[in-house]
Amino acid sequence: MPPKTRSGARRTGRRVVKKNVANGHAYIKSTFNNTIVSITDPKGAVISWASSGHVGFKGSRKSTPFAAQMAAESAARKAMDHGMKKVDVFVKGPGSGRETAIRSLSTAGLEVGTIADVTPQPHNGCRPPKRRRV
């Protein structure tokens, strides 16, 4: 039996399905080390995401407000390619990129509806990290 020959190149990866979603939710998780922006449809399925490290920042530069701005702009551009126009923003975490990320979502062209702070507050749960001595 002769060996089978393949014609054409093999395709790897998943195909990107364009969704046409007009409004959704933007979740901004801003920690002391990084900022992650996820944009979802109203049901919670992720349409686009970006983080400071994903945009190209490394090390301590990931925690800067400028890195958060670039991550939010990248996620907003990808979401607008899917037809996103309006987002409700949910911010979590104590990081420095919170306000900058919200501002850059609106300057990228998304209309920002409501802004909610959903940072979890412990009812005296885990012991916090020790104080830094510099």
Curated annotation (Swiss-Prot):
Listed SUPFAM superfamilies: Translational machinery components
| Ribosomal protein in keyword set | yes
Q: Which GO terms describe its biological process?
A: translation
Give the record's keywords alphabetically.
Ribonucleoprotein, Ribosomal protein, RNA-binding, rRNA-binding
Q: Which domain of life is it from?
A: Bacteria
Pfam families linked: Ribosomal_S11
Keyword Ribonucleoprotein belongs to the record: yes
> What is known about its subunit structure?
Part of the 30S ribosomal subunit. Interacts with proteins S7 and S18. Binds to IF-3.
Q: Which HAMAP family match?
A: Ribosomal_uS11 (MF_01310)
Mind telling me what this protein is named? Small ribosomal subunit protein uS11
Gene for this chain: rpsK
